[in-house]
């Protein structure tokens, strides 16, 4: 969970989970079954106090550490979720198991598109990762622009999706972003 604030509004990037500790120690892995451990999410207190100013939630890609907390925390925020078609489908399946079904407004955005989310203009830039449709972002405001990325790798021959394309990132460098 990352936040960007501008002109009285907030933009959330990702809403994931992680695990409290390894599923098993090295010694246990040879002798016992995997142990259960707590799932951990970021503390949403800060943004819960400002939920009326939360313009939207942008999801970078479909891994649990980026979408896993959304079924549990969205009820606090009740704002649109912006992501790609692939991640949206994974998220919809996850939400239907959590009883939210079609209650969450999920807006599908394509690679290279720019979308206004409140005071933020967000551009989706394709990035290589271990699953389809992972993205980095340029977030533009009247105060300036920033580059946001989550997980990525420079991969000329990925197993899924398209090879890494350096061109958009070189253009950002020329724009001093």
Residue ranges of model-derived segments:
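His/Asp/Glu-rich metal-coordinating catalytic cores
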Residues: 1-58, 63-177
């Amino acid at each position: 969970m990352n936040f960007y604030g501008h002109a009285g509004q907030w933009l959330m990037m990702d809403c994931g989970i992680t695990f409290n500790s390894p599923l098993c120690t090295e010694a246990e892995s040879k002798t016992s079954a995997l142990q259960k451990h707590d799932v951990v999410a970021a503390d949403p207190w800060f943004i819960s106090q400002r939920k009326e100013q939360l313009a939207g939630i942008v999801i970078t890609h479909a891994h649990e550490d980026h979408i896993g907390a959304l079924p549990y925390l969205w009820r606090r925020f009740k704002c649109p979720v912006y992501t790609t078609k692939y991640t949206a489908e994974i998220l919809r399946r996850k939400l239907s198991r959590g009883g939210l079904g079609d209650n969450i407004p999920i807006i599908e955005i394509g690679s290279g598109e720019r979308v206004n989310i409140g005071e933020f203009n967000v551009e989706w830039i394709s990035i290589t990762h271990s699953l389809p449709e992972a993205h980095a972002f340029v977030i533009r405001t009247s105060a300036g622009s920033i580059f946001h990325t989550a997980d990525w790798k420079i991969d000329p021959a990925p197993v899924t999706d398209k090879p890494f394309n350096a061109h958009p990132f070189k253009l950002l460098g020329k724009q001093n972003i």
